[in-house]
């Protein structure tokens, strides 16, 4: 990996009513990473989000969960990245992914937004730069595009939530590998994982 990751973002909608909805799966990864490292995320109004800072394998990693609504996520990411002079290719955005099943997660470098409003705004606010990393947390698909909005804003049943949590936990372990050993090794581990 040529660039180290300096910022991990978990996309979410703000407020307790959204906390356990599928659309907030990206934020669960950041929350779990903060918990593992015993760091409390603090509200930082100038960055429009909850922020923290940890060390992973001797490397500084900033954490961010935007407190804007999902479709304005890029505002928070761009504000923090500009302040700390973090380039798009040093950012990883964790987000829910309709095209992957619950219990599955994958790393990806670059690409489009795939209809995800949080990614769409992030690309836009980073000057149409798509070169950031993504951590895609599978939530499954409701089967028809007209059902997507209600599905992502809904809460998963208990068994499905266990799969989502397991994928988020494994993602946290694989982030350590990514930072220490690079993308391909982390992909080899994460992409063969499937919670049952």
Swiss-Prot record:
Coiled-coil features, chain-numbered ranges: none
GO biological process: protein quality control for misfolded or incompletely synthesized proteins; rescue of stalled ribosome
InterPro entries, A to Z: Pept_tRNA_hydro, Pept_tRNA_hydro_CS, Pept_tRNA_hydro_sf
A Pfam match: Pept_tRNA_hydro
Marked site: Stabilizes the basic form of H active site to accept a proton: 96
Subcellular location: Cytoplasm
Binding site for tRNA: 18, 69, 71, 117
Enzyme Commission code: 3.1.1.29
A single MF term (Gene Ontology): tRNA binding
Chief location category: cytoplasm
One Gene Ontology CC term in the entry: cytoplasm
Gene3D superfamilies: Peptidyl-tRNA hydrolase
Catalyses which reaction(s): an N-acyl-L-alpha-aminoacyl-tRNA + H2O = an N-acyl-L-amino acid + a tRNA + H(+)
Annotated site residues (Discriminates between blocked and unblocked aminoacyl-tRNA) in this chain: 13
Highest taxon listed in the record's lineage: Bacteria
Sequence similarity: Belongs to the PTH family.
Protein name, entry field: Peptidyl-tRNA hydrolase
């Amino acid at each position: 990996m040529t660039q180290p990751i300096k910022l991990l973002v978990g996309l979410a909608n703000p407020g307790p009513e959204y906390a356990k909805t599928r659309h907030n799966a990206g934020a669960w990864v950041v929350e779990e990473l903060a918990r593992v490292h015993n760091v409390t995320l603090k509200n930082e109004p100038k960055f429009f989000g909850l922020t923290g800072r940890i060390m992973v394998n001797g490397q500084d990693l900033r954490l961010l969960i935007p407190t804007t609504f999902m479709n304005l996520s890029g505002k928070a990411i761009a504000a923090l990245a500009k302040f700390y002079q973090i380039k798009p290719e040093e950012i990883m955005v964790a987000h829910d992914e309709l095209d992957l099943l619950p219990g599955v997660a994958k790393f990806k470098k670059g690409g489009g937004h795939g209809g995800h409003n949080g990614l769409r705004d992030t690309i836009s606010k980073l000057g149409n730069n798509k070169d950031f990393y993504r951590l895609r947390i599978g939530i499954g698909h409701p089967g028809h595009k007209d059902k997507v909005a209600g599905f992502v804003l809904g809460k998963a049943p208990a068994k499905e939530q266990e799969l989502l949590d397991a994928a988020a936990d494994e993602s946290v372990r694989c982030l350590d590998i990514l930072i220490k050993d690079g993308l391909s090794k982390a992909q080899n581990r994460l992409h063969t994982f499937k919670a049952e």
